[in-house]
From Swiss-Prot:
UniProt entry keywords in alphabetical sequence: Ribonucleoprotein, Ribosomal protein
Gene Ontology terms for molecular function: structural constituent of ribosome
Gene3D superfamilies xrefs: 1.10.287.3980
Similarity remark: Belongs to the bacterial ribosomal protein bL34 family.
Basic residues compositional bias, start-end: 10-27
Protein known as: Large ribosomal subunit protein bL34
Amino acid sequence: MTKRTFQPNNRRRARKHGFRARMRTRAGRAILSARRGKNRAELSA
């Protein structure tokens, strides 16, 4: 049987997809801006 590929880890999740990770790059800031434009309840992980 194959192993499950999703092995949850909150630190990795935040570092890769968190707010500060998004703010670090221009593309990431564009993502946040788009999510604000859609009035998303959560902007990032």
